[in-house]
UniProtKB/Swiss-Prot annotation:
Record keyword Manganese present: no
Superkingdom: Bacteria
GO cellular component, one term: cytoplasm
Name of the protein described by the UniProt record: Elongation factor Ts
One MF annotation (Gene Ontology) recorded for this entry: translation elongation factor activity
UniProt organism field: Shewanella woodyi (strain ATCC 51908 / MS32)
Family named by the database record: Belongs to the EF-Ts family.
Transmembrane segments: none
Length: 282
């Protein structure tokens, strides 16, 4: 049976697959479009399963405001080339729209978009993962994206420009907490024990070591907290001092960066080539 251009176009419109893939699928099913779609879906699922073990540590961070909150989403792929692909970005934005509409959990997002994800993996040829979504509440929100890789949302009592600048600071300086007093007790105790050991190893008398540790702990809690950090736009002042001068405050922030916490496989090119040569001789 001859496959017509109209059949190929219909299958392509319905699946988003390439023209040659559509023609091949139709040829294999003697022009049965519905069967071709089923076969392509099965093939896509098989390809996605094979790609599932591949590390996806590239991708994008997207932000969108909802009603009284903002959603931050990370979607991963394997290469920065695909991270710029229009199909990948369209998929990520589609997921974001659903997330921002009603604070959908990451588990529900994964389930809702699994079929679409599988089809995209088959089309693009890389593992794709809807990794995480975070929500931040606030009537006064400011967001900042540094390229595609870093996204920040800050909420507080301040004008839009001030909050935007603070969001830029968060992107650059990576604070973990809002205020020094927010650093959890267990984190403080762990660092304190480390600093005591360091001071004692330096041969300092106990009373001097204790004073040194107090100073170092103040520095530590300042460095890991937003208001205790030196402000990137006025390094001689802390963020807290700048906010106080403006009669402003920050109550919360979220910072996401593509791939953070993902263990990346170190590629040994020489070893890879050697393995390929060995395989040809086997």
């Amino acid at each position: 049976m001859a496959i017509t251009a109209a059949q190929v176009k219909e299958l392509r419109d319905r699946t988003g697959a390439g023209m040659m893939d559509c023609k091949k699928a139709l040829t294999e099913t003697a022009g049965d479009i519905e069967l071709a779609i089923d076969n392509m879906r099965k093939s896509g699922a098989a390809k996605a399963a094979k790609k599932a073990g591949n590390i996806a540590a590239e991708g994008t961070i997207l932000i969108k405001n909802g009603e009284g909150y903002a959603a931050l989403l990370e979607v991963n792929c394997q290469t920065d080339f695909v991270a710029k692909d229009s199909n990948f970005l369209a998929f990520a934005n589609e997921v974001l729209d659903v997330a921002a509409a009603s604070k959908v959990t990451i588990e529900d997002l994964k389930a809702q978009f699994e079929e679409t994800r599988v089809a995209l993996v088959a089309k693009i040829g890389e593992n794709i993962n809807v990794r995480r979504v975070e929500y931040i509440d606030g009537a006064n929100l400011a967001q900042y994206r540094h390229g595609e890789r870093i996204g920040v949302v800050v909420t507080g009592e301040a004008d839009e420009e001030t909050l935007k600048h603070v969001a830029m600071h968060v992107a650059a300086s990576k604070p973990e907490y809002v205020n020094p007093s927010d650093v959890p007790a267990e984190v403080v105790e762990k660092e304190k024990a480390l600093q005591i050991e360091i001071a004692m190893n330096e041969g300092k008398p106990a009373e001097i070591a204790e004073k040194m540790v107090i100073g170092r702990m103040k520095k530590f809690t300042g460095e890991v907290s937003l208001t205790g950090q030196a402000y990137i736009m006025e390094p001689k002042k802390t963020v807290g001092e700048v906010l106080k001068e403006k009669g402003a405050s920050v109550s919360n922030f979220i910072r996401l960066e593509v791939g953070e916490g993902i263990e990346r496989k170190e590629e040994d090119f020489a070893a890879e080539v050697a393995a390929q040569i060995a395989a040809t001789k086997a």
